[in-house]
Curated annotation (Swiss-Prot):
Domain ABC transporter: 5-235
Organism per entry: Staphylococcus haemolyticus (strain JCSC1435)
MF (Gene Ontology): ABC-type putrescine transporter activity; ATP binding; ATP hydrolysis activity
Described purpose of this protein according to its UniProt entry: Part of the ABC transporter complex PotABCD involved in spermidine/putrescine import. Responsible for energy coupling to the transport system.
Protein name: Spermidine/putrescine import ATP-binding protein PotA
Catalytic reaction(s) noted: ATP + H2O + polyamine-[polyamine-binding protein]Side 1 = ADP + phosphate + polyamineSide 2 + [polyamine-binding protein]Side 1
Cellular component GO terms, alphabetical: ATP-binding cassette (ABC) transporter complex
Subunit structure: The complex is composed of two ATP-binding proteins (PotA), two transmembrane proteins (PotB and PotC) and a solute-binding protein (PotD).
InterPro entries: AAA+_ATPase, ABC_SmlMolc_Importer, ABC_transporter-like_ATP-bd, ABC_transporter-like_CS, Mo/tungstate-bd_C_term_dom, P-loop_NTPase, PotA_ATP-bd, Transp-assoc_OB_typ2
Family: Belongs to the ABC transporter superfamily. Spermidine/putrescine importer (TC 3.A.1.11.1) family.
Bilayer-crossing regions: none
EC number assigned by the record: 7.6.2.11
Amino acid sequence: MEPLLSFKGVTKGFDDVTILNKMDLEIESGHFYTLLGPSGCGKTTILKLIAGFEQPDDGDIIYLNKSIGELPANKRKVNTVFQDYALFPHLNVYDNIAFGLKLKKHSKKDIDKKVIDALKLVKLSGYEQRNINEMSGGQKQRVAIARAIVNEPEILLLDESLSALDLKLRTEMQYELRELQKRLGITFIFVTHDQEEALALSDYIFVMKDGKIQQFGTPTDIYDEPVNRFVADFIGESNIVEGKMVEDFVVNIYGQDFECVDAGIPSGKNVEVVIRPEDISLIEADKGLFKATVDSMLFRGVHYEICCIDRKGYEWVIQTTKKAEVGSEVGLYFDPEAIHIMVPGETEEEFDKRIESYEEFDNA
């Protein structure tokens, strides 16, 4: 299948600073994509290039097999929902949503139908005459989305559009955005620095750092199989320790061999071992894989977050529903499936090839 949109060696800079350097990416139709990364990583620049607000310095942007690198923003089948919503405060809900349709000289009958349909989709039926200044943050968010989808775009861009909402409302809007994307069936491209938001919303995630894509994949793939230390740390909490590969499916940590599910790495290769906090159990000290001392405990609502210090001085973070006494000695236990092996310096292509090789081994 041909991608809906692709970047081919796109380079973009501002004030002699390169933001994107020969970037390649592909977007297929009908999925929810997220550009995830810290501030300054280039994710909003990608959005501006797709929208037509900026043009690439080099490379090309392809939409349905046609170059759009020089195509003006108003000629693209793309609409954007901005972080501040960019609504007109002097216009009511109806006129805000109808604004673009009026510019395009649609008939009043057509505009009425499209506005009413859009309001129904965002669950604001009956709000046509409401003043924008009388609306809550969540309602303004919905109006901004309605104004975008009324133009029937092929791609909807959302630039950190939930960041101004409080936690409860942001969570509610995550459900609504996901449901809306499925109902519309169009491509959503969402920008955020919030990893939990990205995991909850996305079909696919681009994890970015310093203008480069570190890893692309489904939320599950990226969470369970991070390609490097940055991704492992950025996507949720991680315990990362140094180890050495013994052979396929065996890794040595602290001079002790552990079964794992990774293969395709040379024997004796120095590696980094990732174990998620929720995959570690606290048990009696003598029954654990190794011992540690409880250093602190915080109650996080759905679980306790417990920090333990092992004999090497490394701090382990454990998420569990069971309490532990600060200062007590405990045993740490995890299953082979909880261990993920990262090879320092391994590219995403090399990582994917390695994963595929031992998945084929498992299926043989």
